[in-house]
Amino acid sequence: MSKRDFYEVLGVDRSADEREIKKAYRKLAMKYHPDRNSDDPDAEEKFKEASMAYEVLSDKEKRSAYDRMGHAAFENGMGGGGFGGAGAGNFQDIFGDIFGNFGDIFGQSRGGGGRQRRGSDLRYVIELSLEEAVRGCKKEISFTAPAPCETCDGKGAKNASDIQTCSTCGGHGQVRMQQGFFAVQQTCPNCGGSGQEIKNPCNDCHGTGVKDKSRTLEVSIPAGVDDGDRVRLAGEGEAGGAGVQNGDLYVEVRVKEHPVFKRQGADLYMDVPVSITDAALGKEVEIPTLDGKVKIKVAEGTQSGKLLRVRGKGVTPVRTTMKGDLICRIMVETPVNLTREQKDLLRQFQDTLDGDSKHHQSPKKKSFFEKLGDLFD
């Protein structure tokens, strides 16, 4: 049994109330539950340690004894008198009090007196264009995963009469391991949590009830999904085997880069190139949107980097009704590959600007040199 202070194990003060103790245990149970940490051999021990601490500190009588005597309170008569009756209680009841009916948060479902395993969840990454993600679509996906054996219909046995209640766990799927004063439940080593024994296994799947199979599914992608969103297909994951629930399939969305638009939440962004003359004189410019072409007004004297908002031309994110906007960034283009005549005309035009500085025809330039003057005065 763990010799660490139980309050330290749960990370609570000695004055913590019942609510604080339950909250601390829930956090640790979520973090270290063996079903979520199959690749971490230390997680199960930490989970047991937290469970032991909670079993004592959540019970007023046990907590009082622990506060007076520490671990010594439970080192004598652990299996019989004293606190023996309470200590022999079902650990599953403790866990159920904390998590209610949310056993499948650990990839398992609760059934009968114990908790049965379920097949593993699967992940499939699907690439969509921006248009497909915004409007929604249907996609076919193909993958190979464990599926119910067709020979035995997923039962794992040649005949239904060959399936019997597990003699080790009595059909509960779990066995209780006594650790001194505490009782901790673990998956039954005989039936693997299914609660059943197969006396005459199927020759094709060797009693597992599953075989790898290539599958093709049609997935409905809802309108408005974004990069990283997931679509859950319940029961379409890995087959759990004989008497065990299937896992789920999670289709993860990857939105391909668009040549024109970039998405940020509900809004779309795009760069709109305009010539120097159009920016200086103003012009109505036609731009693309996901709903078709629209015109925007580039006002006279518009500077490069100016943002113009087109209302309602963005995206309606999934599970919302509010549509975003299209944000247009004006990019004033400097002409290149000018002829000699064009260069001369531009110099003449520049001379007219230099001679009429009182009208501030280059506001950014004026502001820049004013700041320089303030800096070096």
UniProtKB/Swiss-Prot annotation:
Which UniProt keyword terms apply here?
A: Chaperone, Cytoplasm, DNA replication, Metal-binding, Repeat, Stress response, Zinc, Zinc-finger
Gene3D superfamilies assigned to the protein according to its UniProt record, in alphabetical order: DnaJ domain, Heat shock protein DnaJ, cysteine-rich domain, Urease metallochaperone UreE, N-terminal domain
Q: Which residues bind Zn(2+) 2?
A: C166, C169, C188, C191
Fetch the InterPro entries from UniProt. Answer: DnaJ, DnaJ_C, DnaJ_domain, DnaJ_domain_CS, HSP40/DnaJ_pept-bd, HSP_DnaJ_Cys-rich_dom, HSP_DnaJ_Cys-rich_dom_sf, J_dom_sf
Cofactor dependency: Zn(2+)
The CR-type zinc finger ranges are 136-214
Q: Where is the composition biased (Basic and acidic residues)?
A: 367-377
Q: Which CDD domains match?
A: DnaJ (cd06257), DnaJ_C (cd10747), DnaJ_zf (cd10719)
Tell me the ranges covered by the J domain, including all copies.
5-70
In terms of superkingdom, the source organism counts as Bacteria
Subunit field text: Homodimer.
Function, please? Participates actively in the response to hyperosmotic and heat shock by preventing the aggregation of stress-denatured proteins and by disaggregating proteins, also in an autonomous, DnaK-independent fashion. Unfolded proteins bind initially to DnaJ; upon interaction with the DnaJ-bound protein, DnaK hydrolyzes its bound ATP, resulting in the formation of a stable complex. GrpE releases ADP from DnaK; ATP binding to DnaK triggers the release of the substrate protein, thus completing the reaction cycle.
From the Swiss-Prot or TrEMBL record, give the protein name.
Answer: Chaperone protein DnaJ
Provide the species name: Psychrobacter sp. (strain PRwf-1)
